[in-house]
Amino acid sequence: MKGQVVRIIAGFYDVVDLKNRKLYPLLRGSGLLRLNETSPIVGDFVDFEEKGFIKKIYERKNQLIRPKVANIDQALVFISIREPNFSSLLLDKFLLVIEAKNIPVILLVTKIDLDSNFENLLLDYQKMNYNIFFINNKKNEIPVELKAELEKKLNFVIGQTGVGKTSFINNFLDKKFAIQEISQTLNRGKHTTRVVQIIEKENFRIIDSPGFSSFSYSEISKNEIRNAFKIFKKFSSDCKFRSCFHFQEKTDQCGIKRALKDGKIPENRYKNYLYFLGKYEKKNY
């Protein structure tokens, strides 16, 4: 049978049959997979036996290393306005990894009730044509347009701890996962998600994952960083040299610098790019 891995705990795999959506828990990897040092990850499409082993892992259309997930249709990137405070650097760190894998992005902005100026903080991202939804979890309201965007797709949830991911999932899927209040001393939420898993209800599927501290962009090469952002891909074709890193090159030789000068790329996005490039050079992830 063909299925998809929805959860992994202590070397056991829970798999959903793609045909009838029945859950088959506690499967193991076959001896051949172990011999080849190959292990399934959440999101993998696999061939499996009803009461036994996973026999085959199908080719992945995309994959993240930390957390280990595969075959994502789109990413739901959560960012809060306050508690924790909005940070374009943190948001761009998430987008750097997601867009490097060519995964479509939806930005979900939470805690909008804590700052009346919330829309202005996202102006640069609106200008870059990101798909943005403003969410108030306290009102338990999910925009109809957002539901339509998520239907029949595998949606990967990512964001700093404490931004309201679990509250959103509870509201959206009408499930009750553990929620903890923001830690005032650390200005961040306590981790409420401990395993990567696919949560499913009707035509909606969401990959919930551990919070910010386990999310890494160290898997990205220097070459990937230079054109990871979607808007950089758009203008980098105008660079004179294919190896352009949009840093030391002259403006007339760099499509990114010209777009920056013309106001087509926000200055803050370019500054964040230089920060990530510098972090890579220092090997300080």
UniProtKB/Swiss-Prot annotation:
Ranges of residues in domain CP-type G: 61-215
Any one cellular-component term (Gene Ontology): cytoplasm
MF-aspect GO terms: GTP binding; GTPase activity; metal ion binding; rRNA binding
Cofactor note: Binds 1 zinc ion per subunit.
Binding-site list for GTP: 110-113, 159-167
Disulfide bond entries: none
This protein's UniProt keywords: Cytoplasm, GTP-binding, Hydrolase, Metal-binding, Nucleotide-binding, Ribosome biogenesis, RNA-binding, rRNA-binding, Zinc
SUPFAM superfamilies: Nucleic acid-binding proteins, P-loop containing nucleoside triphosphate hydrolases
GO biological process, one term: ribosomal small subunit biogenesis
Catalytic activity, EC: 3.6.1.-
Amino-acid positions noted as binding Zn(2+) in the UniProt annotation, renumbered to this chain: 239, 244, 246, 254
Membership in a protein family: Belongs to the TRAFAC class YlqF/YawG GTPase family. RsgA subfamily.
Protein name per UniProt: Small ribosomal subunit biogenesis GTPase RsgA
Gene, per the UniProt record: rsgA
